[in-house]
Each structure stands twice: as structure tokens, then as C-alpha cells.
């Protein structure tokens, strides 16, 4: 499964305006990653896990259901985080010039495919 997931991430990075993508456990452990830059996936995994945990807690406190996605936009780029049940998240890093809707749509599509592949094994 990891090789199929890596291919999915590689395809996303070559067909979409993204700098890299990775699948992490919700605990913050790297699972599969594909970054075009020298990005340290262990560092990104820890930050994504922190954001995920905080967001899950917020949704619980506000009684807004389960977490589906997070979009973080900065002046130099954006990161889209999408839940990949069971127990994983997909993080997609894109430059500022990338259209948020396009990146988000591609991330959701890849997350669905990742979920399907992971569920086949487990």
C-alpha cells in the first residue's frame, strides 16, 4: 500500500500546482510523503498533528461533528489538510499562486483514494 500511496502523491504533485504532499498518522508520525523541496516530513507531521488535534477538540466543544478538512493560508502559500480515515491525514502544500479551490478539490480526491487503499488492507 505505501508504494501505491506514494504514486498517488507523486501524481498529485506533478499534475496539480502543489509543492508536496504527505500522509501522516493523527498522532504525528510520517507514513508516506512526496515533497519537491527539502521539506522535513517529521517536522511537518508534528505540526499537522497539532493542528488536527486542536481542530478536533474545537469541533467537539462546539458540537460541530467530525473534522473533514483544514485550510491554512499564509502570504507565501497554503496548506490543505484532509482527514483520511481511519487515523490518517493528508497534507498538501501549495504556493500562494495556486488556486485554493483547485488544491482543495485535488486534495479531497486524493484523500478519498487513500482511504480506499488503506481500508482494503486493514
Language model: regions and residue ranges:
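Acidic, low-complexity cytosolic segments
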Residues: 1-20, 27-122
Amino acid at each position: 500500500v505505501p508504494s501505491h500511496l506514494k504514486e498517488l502523491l507523486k501524481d498529485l504533485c506533478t499534475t496539480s500546482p502543489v509543492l508536496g504532499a504527505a500522509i501522516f498518522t493523527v498522532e504525528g508520525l510520517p507514513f508516506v510523503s512526496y515533497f519537491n523541496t527539502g521539506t522535513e516530513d517529521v517536522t511537518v507531521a508534528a505540526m499537522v498533528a497539532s493542528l488536527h488535534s486542536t481542530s478536533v477538540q474545537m469541533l467537539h466543544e462546539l458540537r460541530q461533528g467530525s473534522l473533514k478538512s483544514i485550510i491554512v493560508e499564509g502570504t507565501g502559500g497554503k496548506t490543505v489538510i484532509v482527514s483520511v480515515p481511519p487515523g490518517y491525514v493528508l497534507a498538501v502544500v501549495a504556493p500562494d499562486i495556486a488556486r485554493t479551490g483547485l488544491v482543495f478539490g485535488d486534495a479531497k480526491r486524493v484523500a478519498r483514494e487513500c482511504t480506499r487503499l488503506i481500508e482494503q488492507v486493514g
